[in-house]
Design a protein with these regions (language model features):
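Ribonuclease/tRNase effector modules and their secretory precursors
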Residues: 1-134
């Protein structure tokens, strides 16, 4: 797929993918997923439309959307969705922001981004779903 920040096409669905970061060893250790450090994390061209459904939750939607790579690379908290199919990167920006990355055998892809209320965040933290990221 193209280099960081470049879009490349998927012939199957006509979705273009862009690199937004890489999977760190710390993320692997924290979530126990079976992937290798340094694997590229992509976002599909179809995701912004999906994610924009949550735009009213954000003080600055476009600014936060443009920080997805930073959220993945330097989250404050990390966890795994209970269904085991995605990693959740949480960063405390203007809002508690969650970026979910789908765990797939062939590719790691951003699935969604949305805010977390303080109540929801604290419940998930208390249940052990999230842990502080190094």
């Amino acid at each position: 797929m193209g280099g960081r920040g470049q879009w490349s096409r998927s012939s199957r669905k006509r979705i273009r993918y862009k690199s937004v970061g890489t999977l760190s060893q710390s993320a692997i250790d924290a979530t126990g997923i079976n992937h290798s450090a340094g694997e590229t994390i992509y976002i599909g061209s179809d995701r912004k439309g999906h994610i924009s459904k949550h735009k009213d939750e954000f003080t600055d939607f476009n600014g936060t959307y443009n920080r997805i790579g930073e959220i993945i690379g330097s989250p404050d908290y990390i966890g795994k969705h209970p269904n085991g199919q995605s990693i959740e990167f949480v960063k405390r920006l203007e809002e508690n922001t969650l970026v979910a990355v789908r765990i797939n055998q062939s590719k790691l892809t951003v699935r969604t981004m949305h805010t977390l209320s303080e109540v929801t965040f604290n419940k998930r933290l208390a249940k052990g779903r999230y842990r502080r990221y190094n």
